[in-house]
Amino acid sequence: MSTNNSDIRVVVGMSGGVDSSVTAHILKEQGYDVIGIFMKNWDDTDEFGVCTATEDYDDVIRVANQIGIPYYAVNFEKEYWDKVFTYFLDEYKLGRTPNPDVMCNKEIKFKAFLEHAESLGADYVATGHYAQVKKVGDEIELLRGVDNNKDQTYFLNQLSQDQLKKVMFPLGGMEKTEVREIAKKAGLATANKKDSTGICFIGERNFKQFLSEYLPAQPGEMRTLNGEVLGKHDGLMYYTIGQRHGLGIGGDGEPWFVVGKDLKENVLFVEQGFHHETLYSDSLIATDISFTTNAEKPKTIECTAKFRYRQTDTKVTVHLREDGTAEVVFADPVRAITPGQAVVFYDGDICLGGGTIDTVWKNGAKLDYVG
């Protein structure tokens, strides 16, 4: 055990899953002064009256006791509601498709949680994210995780230098299979626990049903771009650009896809064919632009970008504008760019930062994806 690490306090965000369990285990093995914190972000009771957060916290307790670290539960429900859930609902009201994971990392895990950890004397916080940080000169670079399938830099694109200087990602250099193996060898209680998927506050519940509890659904017409009425939609908030499932349009030929929303008229526009021309665009305007380093940026950046999680990178040219927005021009047309989602910039394995997709363009004209 390294002696110098024992003077360094690391507070680990523990969710009750295998990734954060192994994160805490590794840091403890490396001799750090480790504290486990369970973040309670949502008052979550399933249909049987069981609070799933309680089950997860029980797993945190089991693992913390196994590896011999102190643990606490901290309630961030108010911060989460104000900063993440309110944003989530507001975006749906605007007809967009939000990314709560990006906002949660920016406002909760690496802000509210980081501040709480510092009040406990933390030198660093650590999470089970599949990403890497590397010190280069005076700055910290955010790098993709080694496991391509699990890399989570897309969701971390809004982190600043001040945040990155305080984080550790022990799993960033590992494949998921290795993480499971470490958990099994260490006999951790969460070694065989299945990964959680989807949006944390929805859990296993039906998305439509969940959203309708907070936003009133307004059914309306489903039309082609030529105005032919094909049926009814359940509420514009339930649909996203490029969506195929749940439209309820039968018949012969190719499947139908969502190609736009008219909020004023409450109309959902659909067209036939995966490669319908309306689904393709050549540029976008992004807001909330944030970079992971403080270095001076040129007005034009040649790099690659992701427009959704686990998507293959696309070559782009980013033009930073005076108003703080950015025009992102694609080397090749891209399908189903979705307003409200994150656009994230990369230079090789370095995550440069990103922003929020606001409008989508083709041949110099704005597409009416959300109008």
Curated annotation (Swiss-Prot):
EC assignment: 2.8.1.13
One function term, GO molecular function aspect: ATP binding
One Gene Ontology term, aspect cellular component: cytoplasm
Q: Which reaction does it catalyse?
A: S-sulfanyl-L-cysteinyl-[protein] + uridine(34) in tRNA + AH2 + ATP = 2-thiouridine(34) in tRNA + L-cysteinyl-[protein] + A + AMP + diphosphate + H(+)
Q: List the disulfide bonds.
A: C104-C200
Entry's localization field: Cytoplasm
Looking up Pfam families in the UniProt record yields: tRNA_Me_trans, tRNA_Me_trans_C, tRNA_Me_trans_M
Residues annotated as region Interaction with tRNA?
A: 150-152, 308-309
Site location (Interaction with tRNA): H129, Q341
Q: Which InterPro entries match?
A: MnmA-like (IPR004506), MnmA-like_C (IPR046885), MnmA-like_central (IPR046884), MnmA-like_central_sf (IPR023382), Rossmann-like_a/b/a_fold (IPR014729)
Would you say which domain of life the source belongs to? Bacteria
Q: Where is the active site?
A: C104 (nucleophile), C200 (cysteine persulfide intermediate)
Q: Which of this chain's residues are annotated to bind ATP?
A: G13, M14, S15, G16, G17, V18, D19, S20, M39, G128
Instruction: Name the segments for region: Interaction with target base in tRNA.
Output: 99-101
Per the record, the GO terms for biological process are: tRNA wobble position uridine thiolation
Residues spanning the membrane: none
Q: Which family does it belong to?
A: Belongs to the MnmA/TRMU family.
Q: Please give the function described in this protein's UniProt entry.
A: Catalyzes the 2-thiolation of uridine at the wobble position (U34) of tRNA, leading to the formation of s(2)U34.
Q: What protein am I looking at?
A: tRNA-specific 2-thiouridylase MnmA
User: What gene, per UniProt, encodes this protein?
Assistant: mnmA
